[in-house]
Amino acid sequence: MGYRKLTEVELSNKSVLLRLDLNAPIENGFVTNKERIYRSIPTITHIINKDCSLILMSHLGRPEENNEFQPKYSLKPVVKVLEEILDREIPLYSLEELEKLNQKPTISILENSRFYVGEKDNDVGLSNRLSDLADIFVMDAFATSHRAHASTTGVIRFSKEACAGLLLDEELTALTKVKKNADHSIAILGGAKISTLSLIHISEPTRRTV
């Protein structure tokens, strides 16, 4: 599979829009599982160490797509965790606020991408607005890379440069190795839904490994 890697892109003095998967579970305003956030850190630190401005972007949950702020689905709890890990302040902006900034901070984050009308429909207008936020688009949200949304695929069409982040590259490399070295059919199951267990039991008589 051919794609451009983050390590192959010149980042110095550029602005970067980084699509992550920060869709972490939240209860009473606190993140209860930080794994996805921690897995995003290597790509974030790689970029901010290159003397450039960085905008983080992610979805959270399934809010109504109506261009309005919905507190239940705000990325604020996620931002708090990121600030603790990176030991720096990370301002949270709406798309409109980011578009009005004359000079963007070293690092900032766009509020929940699913707040905006056109995200799930891969709207051309929204995709274009997102691409205008930065010089380079970096896709590092492996868990949502199968979705043709404005913030995952649409933005790539209009970006000056686009590449795969460190996590996405790691996952794709692992999948390629499995596929290349397999001598029989392979089924890869993902997710944490109990309903998938029945499928595993059904396939048990014919499988070699789960």
Question: Which role fits each region the language model picked out?
Answer:
Residues 1-203, 207:
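Active-site loop-to-helix "anion-binding N-cap" substructures in soluble metabolic enzymes
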